[in-house]
A protein has these predicted regions:
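Glycine-rich flexible loops
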Residues: 2-257
């Protein structure tokens, strides 16, 4: 088969929308947003049993966080915990994991981060174990085309502040990181962007593995992938998180309780 180059990629233009894409979600509280994000990401492969934590920065400087002991596919808004900037529990019915230290250090160093996600996702953890970032082979993988940091000095846990600080330093300005022999870390400004980046990166990890298993392939043109990712980083992917949230609410209407 001959692959024909179509010329130099050109930047995408925003679509003009004159009516809604689909039914709107009800007005959500921050805790409801976090619960929906956890459910959506569980469906995408962020599903390692009790592992994983999501922090959602609030205007008053506190953070919402999922509790330890509940899987992401059973989390409801009423389960969501609140902690201060040092990781101390302020409110909620359950317990906050000691491993939240990584998020505490991240938020102290990166004031641009509104949402931080850590889990041992099914496909991302494979590449964390390999110790390198996968190539981008398709458009969905390119929805996040920023830097992927690889932190390869894993000491067995990140609940020690020194280890967490080392991971944050190694990450720099990247918004996605592979923690070698551990898992994935995704940072974003808000809930919708967090879902987009986490979903896209897990998709990328899965597709790259399948392409390699099939004998290899040609990665997406880097400039085209960058244009595509930059566009959706700027304009968001209107309706994406809402559609996936509606899917989860169809499965379990009690998420917002």
């Amino acid at each position: 088969m001959t692959v024909v180059e179509s010329g130099k990629p050109t930047p995408m233009k925003a679509m003009k929308v004159t009516k809604p894409y689909a039914p709107a979600l009800p007005e959500l509280t921050p805790a409801q947003e976090l619960a929906l994000l956890a459910r959506c990401l569980f469906s995408e492969g962020y599903d390692d049993h009790l592992a994983g934590h999501i922090t959602h920065k609030q205007p008053d400087g506190t953070f919402l966080v999922n509790p330890f002991g509940l899987t992401w596919d059973e989390l409801r808004a009423s389960d969501v915990m609140r902690m201060d900037a040092d990781g101390n529990e302020l409110d909620g019915p359950w317990t906050i994991t000691p491993a939240i230290t990584l998020h505490v250090e991240l938020h102290k160093a990166r004031h641009d981060v509104g949402v931080a996600i850590h889990n041992h996702s099914r496909w991302g953890t494979i590449w964390a174990d390999i110790g390198r970032a996968p190539e981008v082979y398709d458009q969905t993988s390119a929805l996040y085309h920023g830097e992927v940091a690889v932190y390869d000095e894993y000491w067995g846990a990140v609940d020690d502040p020194r280890n967490a600080q080392s991971a944050v330093k190694a990450m720099g300005d990247a918004n996605v990181a592979l923690l070698a022999n551990h898992g994935v870390l995704v940072l974003a400004g808000d809930i919708e962007q967090a879902y987009l980046r986490a979903m896209s990166f897990e998709w990328r990890c899965r597709q790259a593995w399948h392409v390699a298993a099939a004998g290899g392939g040609t990665p997406m043109n880097r400039e085209a992938a960058r244009n595509y990712g930059d566009f959706f980083n700027t304009h968001q992917f209107t309706g994406l998180f809402e559609a996936m949230a509606r899917r989860e609410l169809r499965r379990d209407p009690t998420i917002l309780d």
